[in-house]
Structures are given as structure tokens and as C-alpha cells.
């Protein structure tokens, strides 16, 4: 807050720590975590570089020209921040890197990190378990036919659910039928 006439202002608090893509940042418990072009960072009042034991593995093969595809998510069930990203030879997000922010890093000076390869699902969005009992995510399907989300959870039970938002049908009833909302 800077007062009249501008009310609010911006103050630069870090350098060489910019965001790699608009969806590559997440906030949990007042701390922001993000993936930059050259490392992982957090902000809790000051910018911190996150020591990362897998940083070379991630950044030696990431396609930084596809930064807008990178997305971040939180898994509160395991105190994890997850980033999905494309590798140099991939068209879509084919890998992920996970940071466990809840573990005591005194015994792990490089932090608690692990990586994985997306073999069955190319993640593009994620919502934490604060809304539902478990996290929900979507996957990208590059086939040339239309695709619809497979919903895991209370009502989806792994079934493909068809939403026709263009014509107003967006309610799926427990018996599988749809109701047009007007």
C-alpha cells in the first residue's frame, strides 16, 4: 500500500528468478512456490532458491520454449508441490518433478525431491484435495477425435463423462443421465 493517488505499488524483491510459465506457480500456507527458467523458488516474505537434488535432470532436458505448458499443483495429502513439464523432444508435458515442502530439510540439504515420467496421462490442470477428498487432474489427449474427461471421484468412478456446455447440458445425474439446465 503506497497511498493516494496510486493506492498500491510494486516492489522488486528478486532477480533471475522469473516464472517459466503462467501456470508454473502455486501458493500453499502463505508460501508461493514456482518454477523458473533456471531453478525452483519460494517466497515467504523473501525470495528463496530451493536447493534441488534433481535440478540437473530436469533442466538438462526441459523445453523452455514451451513454458506456457508447464503447470503446477499441490497435493496436500503428502505436502507436495508438483510441476508437469515437456522435455526437449516432447510435444506435451511428459515428465513431472515433485518437491515435498513438509519434510524437515535439516537432514536433506538438497530438499526432498523426486521425478517421474507421464506414461499414461499428460497432465494439464490440477485441483487439490481441499475441494474433494482426493486431488482431481485432467490429462491431454492428442488424438484427432473429440475427447472428454475421465472423472475419478465420488460420482465418476473412472467413467468417461460427457459435458455439452455449448447447448447447456452440464449436469450429470447419479444414474448417468444428463439434465439440461436452463
Residue locations for each model-derived region?
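Beta-sheet repeat architectures centered on beta-propellers
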Residues: 16-31, 37-182
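Surface-exposed extracellular loop regions of Gram-negative outer-membrane beta-barrel proteins
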Residues: 1-14
Amino acid at each position: 500500500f503506497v497511498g493516494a493517488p496510486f493506492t498500491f505499488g510494486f516492489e522488486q524483491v528478486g532477480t533471475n528468478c522469473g516464472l517459466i510459465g503462467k501456470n508454473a506457480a502455486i501458493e500453499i500456507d502463505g508460501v508461493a512456490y514456482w518454477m523458473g527458467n533456471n531453478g525452483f523458488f519460494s517466497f515467504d516474505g523473501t525470495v528463496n532458491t530451493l536447493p534441488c537434488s534433481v535440478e540437473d535432470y530436469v533442466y538438462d532436458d526441459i523445453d523452455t520454449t514451451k513454458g506456457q505448458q508447464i503447470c503446477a499443483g499441490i497435493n496436500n495429502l503428502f505436502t507436495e508441490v508438483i510441476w508437469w513439464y515437456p522435455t526437449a523432444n516432447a510435444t506435451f508435458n511428459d515428465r513431472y518433478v515433485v518437491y515435498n515442502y513438509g519434510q524437515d530439510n535439516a537432514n536433506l540439504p538438497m530438499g526432498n525431491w523426486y521425478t517421474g515420467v507421464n506414461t499414461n496421462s499428460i497432465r494439464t490442470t490440477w485441483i487439490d484435495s481441499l475441494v474433494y477428498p482426493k486431488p482431481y487432474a485432467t490429462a491431454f489427449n492428442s488424438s484427432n477425435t473429440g475427447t472428454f474427461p475421465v472423472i475419478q471421484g465420488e460420482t465418476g468412478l473412472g467413467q468417461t463423462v460427457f459435458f455439452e456446455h455449448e447447448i447447456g447440458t452440464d449436469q450429470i445425474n447419479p444414474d448417468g443421465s444428463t439434465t439440461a439446465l436452463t
